[in-house]
UniProtKB/Swiss-Prot annotation:
Organism: Salmonella arizonae (strain ATCC BAA-731 / CDC346-86 / RSK2980)
Lineage: Bacteria, Pseudomonadati, Pseudomonadota, Gammaproteobacteria, Enterobacterales
Gene symbol of the encoding locus: yihY
PANTHER family: INNER MEMBRANE PROTEIN YHJD, UPF0761 MEMBRANE PROTEIN YIHY
Keywords recorded for this protein, A-Z: Cell inner membrane, Cell membrane, Membrane, Transmembrane, Transmembrane helix
Membrane-topology descriptor: Multi-pass membrane protein
Keyword Transmembrane helix: yes
Protein name in the entry: UPF0761 membrane protein YihY
Places the protein is found: Cell inner membrane
Source taxon at top rank: Bacteria
Family membership noted in the UniProt record: Belongs to the UPF0761 family.
InterPro entries listed in its UniProt record: UPF0761_bac (IPR023679), Virul_fac_BrkB (IPR017039)
NCBIfam families documented for this protein: PRK01637.1, yihY_not_rbn
Length: 290
């Protein structure tokens, strides 16, 4: 009886072990951690230009003036580690300085922000091992659409949420809205990763694989955010070594960790499809044997 149970358990766990082995093999072959390091470096160079462009877009639409402040607080409270307040002050100071730049300098900021999106495009297509390339004009249009529509849609969603919460007559509804807003960071991460894994690769990505990979990445991102915040508060080694400059390595480690999660979600997405193809090929080969 016990032997039968072990045999059944082995049959159920064998596909999981095979998939995990394939996942690890792809992570090693794609040099995922090196790609994450490259993206972290480009992200740090593009962070201030990207935020400057986003805030400039909000400034161009007066109806989003109040929402831009809420969006700033929401991003730094939900997508940054425990030192988000310090990082926010520094970044806002850098952005304020960038607003004094000339038109040529502003164009340079936009180009730098677009370079980050190009780096993301290259990294994800490296993981998908896609040989196809998009026309440059089409790629630029996609990058620009993400750069402009993304922040505006986020601002619109926050404006709607604030409006609903301001309706005092809907006291029964406020409890439901509070619960929705509590899971909003996870939901936004899930949707963002799903769009990233579905749109950016130049090859066709099965929707269910993108949903699963995005969900795992979103869960790891939320868990990593809380774990990183706990590490910073419980083991303040960076503050002890670097003092007031501790925000620099903390930000770099957090950005690197974030890109590791994003690329791991991409590896999971592509491995699900590859494992399914390998399994179907093995079953077909077994069926063809006399």
């Amino acid at each position: 009886m016990l032997k039968t149970v072990h045999q059944k358990a082995g049959r159920h766990t064998r596909p999981v072990r095979a998939w995990l082995k394939l996942l690890w093999q792809r992570i090693d072959e794609d040099n995922m951690t090196t790609l994450a390091g490259n993206l972290a470096y480009v992200s740090l160079l593009s962070l201030v230009p990207l935020i400057a462009v986003v805030f400039a877009l909000f400034a161009a639409f007066p109806m989003f003036s109040d929402v831009s402040i809420q969006l700033r607080h929401f991003i730094f409270a939900n997508f940054m580690p425990a030192t988000g307040d310090v990082i926010q002050r520094y970044i806002e100071q850098f952005v304020a300085n960038s607003n004094k730049m000339t038109a040529v300098g502003a164009c340079g900021l936009i180009v730098t922000a677009l370079l980050l999106m190009y780096a993301i495009d290259s990294a994800l297509n490296t993981i998908w091992r896609s040989k196809r390339t998009r026309p440059k004009v089409y790629s630029f249009a996609v990058y620009w659409m993400i750069l402009t529509l993304g922040p505006l849609l986020a601002g619109a969603s926050l404006a709607i949420s604030s409006y609903l919460l301001s309706l005092r007559w809907a006291s029964d509804l406020n409890t439901v809205i509070d619960n929705v807003l509590r899971v909003l960071p996870l939901l936004l991460s899930w949707i963002s990763f799903w769009l990233l894994y579905s749109i950016v690769p130049t090859t066709r990505v099965p929707n269910r694989d993108a949903i699963v990979g995005a969900f795992v990445a979103a869960l790891l991102f939320e868990a990593g955010k809380k774990g990183f915040a706990l590490y910073i508060t419980m083991f303040p080694s960076y503050q002890l070594i670097y003092g007031v400059l501790a925000v620099i390595p903390i930000l770099f480690v957090w950005v690197y960790w974030t890109w590791c999660i994003v690329l791991l979600g991409a590896e999971i997405t592509v491995t699900l499809g590859e494992y399914r193809k390998l399994k179907q090929a093995a079953e077909q080969e077994e069926a063809d044997q006399p």
